[in-house]
Amino acid sequence: MKQTVYTASPESQQIHVWSLNHEGTLTLVQVVDVPGQVQPMVVSPDKRYLYVGVRPEFRVLAYRIAPDDGALTFAAESALPGSPTHISTDHHGRFVFVGSYNAGNVSVTRLQDGLPVELVDVVEGLDGCHSANITPDNRTLWVPALKQERICLFTLSDDGHLVAQEPAEVNTVEGAGPRHMVFHPNRQYAYCVNELNSSVDVWQLKNPHGEIECVQTLDMMPADFSDTRWAADIHITPDGRHLYACDRTASLITVFSVSEDGSVLSVEGFQPTEAQPRGFNIDNSGKYLIAAGQKSHHIAVYEITGTQGLLTEKGRYAVGQGPMWVVVNAY
């Protein structure tokens, strides 16, 4: 298995393309100059395209991924109705979802042969919209609205329109600020990192109709932490055994173990990392975690070790200015 790591640096308007080997070493393949401040990125389900959100001219860009080394070639673009904060796709590669924090909306762009061709739907009134997350069955889009302390739930229609479910939302605790999410591989649980109080909520998917319930909330900060809380990103290993979340003020990655059924998290430890970690990701083998330091202008590679999933640093690498996003592609 070959793996490529992509890092987005908006301040220098660059994407760095790296080859990741089996020992956790990165080798630079390409530096792409992007026409705008590049932030959120996602790889298409068929692993042939990288979709990128840019500002201040709000667009989604599509880059073809070379099958031999992961290098990028620009392919297409499509306008967006707001500044892109988060980008994702459905599991069949038919639609791109873009959440916009500043505009307070989530948009759906149709894909044709892997390329963005037209805006299909826009849902407004999502104050502080921070991500858009399709359920493993490809039926429901979960949209955390940070400023409204809620997660909005939409059914994805065959033509890409979003229809509010009943109930249309679930509330988080006051002052939480739901931000990013991941789903457990067993499809029965989801985990949401809350930006404002640096906690993680465990949500149970109760039935196929989209009903969900919060079954656990866990503080992700050390007991003696007294500064402003500012959580950012969350990811789970492919086997569902280990979960990680980061806080930017503390420049810390919190390590969680996940119970066998996915319902219970336990804090295993804390890993100091690059300054102001805005984004990170886990490779497809579940062996390495790559974190980006928005203030250090570096990325760091960690090996995931032992039954607790603790992190051991393998190396750090200079990237562009203000790196914010990391994605990994395997082929």
Curated annotation (Swiss-Prot):
EC number per UniProt: 3.1.1.31
GO biological process: glucose metabolic process; pentose-phosphate shunt, oxidative branch
Keyword Cell division: no
Summary of the function given for this chain in its UniProt record: Catalyzes the hydrolysis of 6-phosphogluconolactone to 6-phosphogluconate.
Catalytic activity of the protein: 6-phospho-D-glucono-1,5-lactone + H2O = 6-phospho-D-gluconate + H(+)
Record GO cellular component, one term: cytosol
Family designation: Belongs to the cycloisomerase 2 family.
Keywords tagged on the record: Carbohydrate metabolism, Glucose metabolism, Hydrolase
GO molecular function: 6-phosphogluconolactonase activity
Signal peptide: none
Pathway named in the protein's UniProt entry: Carbohydrate degradation; pentose phosphate pathway; D-ribulose 5-phosphate from D-glucose 6-phosphate (oxidative stage): step 2/3
Domain of life: Bacteria
Origin species: Salmonella paratyphi A (strain AKU_12601)
Name under which the protein is recorded: 6-phosphogluconolactonase
Gene3D superfamilies: YVTN repeat-like/Quinoprotein amine dehydrogenase
HAMAP family: 6P_gluconolactonase
